[in-house]
């Protein structure tokens, strides 16, 4: 057990997600399931690194992922409950600010608090990600991660998104476990 409950994998552009076939989504889902086994993980969230979708493209990507995983679609998210008891959630919105606006719009004004926003931003997961695995350059933070950056550890991997392997996520978990988490604290 590594203390990991929720891992977010951020990779690929919206164009790459559009071009990802049902078979490739099956493979990616299998790789993520394999990586989660044995470490106590309950949720994996996947989102694009950068880009945007038209409404028609968003629906196309969601349907392709749902067909590959047997998951259910709710707006911009496809959720798949794995046989091993954890949930994989694919959020097709690559714009963190837009995701925030969408979540805020979905809540009644009287219910908007930091807690309700956090819960809605990570739904179906109940917690902020412990670890974010970024498939992209280490000198640039993905625009999709506006909300998650405050309390999550980032690990950057060099593997191109569509070649994601369980070993990439397992190596990121290994890197995570050797870090001293300070949760925004600084040395005095």
Descriptions of predicted regions:
Residues 1-188:
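Flexible, compositionally biased loop and terminal segments
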């Amino acid at each position: 057990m590594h203390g990991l409950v929720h891992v977010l994998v951020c990779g690929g552009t919206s164009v790459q997600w559009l071009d990802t076939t049902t078979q490739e989504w099956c493979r990616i889902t299998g790789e993520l399931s394999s990586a989660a086994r044995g470490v106590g993980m309950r949720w994996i969230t996947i989102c694009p690194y950068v880009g945007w979708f038209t409404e028609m493209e968003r629906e196309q990507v969601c349907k392709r992922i749902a067909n590959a995983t047997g998951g259910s679609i709710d707006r911009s998210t496809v959720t798949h409950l794995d046989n091993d008891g954890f949930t994989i959630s694919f959020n097709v919105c690559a714009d963190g600010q837009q995701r925030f606006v969408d979540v805020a719009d979905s809540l009644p004004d009287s219910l908007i608090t930091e807690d309700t926003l956090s819960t809605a931003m990570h739904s179906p997961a109940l917690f902020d990600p412990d670890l974010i695995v970024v498939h992209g350059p280490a000198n640039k933070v993905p625009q999709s991660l506006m909300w998650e950056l405050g309390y999550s550890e980032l690990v950057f991997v060099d593997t191109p998104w569509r070649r994601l392997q369980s070993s990439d996520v397992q190596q990121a978990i290994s890197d995570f476990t050797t870090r001293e988490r300070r949760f925004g604290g600084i040395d005095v």
